[in-house]
């Protein structure tokens, strides 16, 4: 739990990275650059699980110096150690290669001390006074992540189930290959397609299509059979949907923040805060549904959690059809 807490605290770098891209990009450059940063996450998502699966249980996989009782008793230590070294390398690269994105006169002259911690922790409540367009985007992202993390928390439970019980009978390495494929699709969509698509279609439309594809994919789990082609088809829907959603939503949020004259880092921080709540609630909710339905029959079976995740994604889609106020539309027009 402590390790997960520290990892979650470190996720603040996501908001900073997106704000950095927003600071140095024009509106025309935003979709492509948000796509590139999303593609980098996708690349890690592609390679990471595969490496993790390969490094798991080195006593059995590699033998030699790892063929000891200690490595047999700690089969997951090597992938965790490798991940920690990668995180350290990332920090060093950020210090070495990234200059400050804002000129000195645009930087906030505020000291961060213990007196400001409470103020920073209450920033989530500032969502209530933000413009409706920004609130809708933040809530959409939060609900989308809720659906996505519900799937992510239970997908491996499903794939590890024996085939006779309705699962796929996959081991850690096979699951790693599946997630590597998901990452590959994400890299293709965010690293190349999103830039071209944003030149032909509205960014908001791309975001909505991404949510719809993800909802369809989530609702299609578990698959009718463990046939690899069907597995990859459904995961393609989810990966492509997420690949369209993430950069499009970040682009829209950046644009709306600029239109309303809001601090981009603060807005991104609020969004990541709500996203963190979704990442907490999603796995807990999914585990509860899974435990209550996995041995059921009829409508209440191991299918249920994935169907619920799909419905949650549809709810995220519906949030975007709530009307903006007339005052806000007029204000945006004048801006």
What is the predicted role of each segment?
Residues 87-97, 221, 305-335:
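Multi-pass alpha-helical transporter architecture, strongest
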Residues 2-41:
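Cytoplasmic helix-loop-helix junction between adjacent transmembrane helices
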Residues 32-60, 272-282:
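Glycine-rich segments within core transmembrane alpha-helices of 12-TM secondary carriers
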Residues 204-249:
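C-terminal transmembrane helical hairpin of 12-TM major facilitator-type secondary transporters
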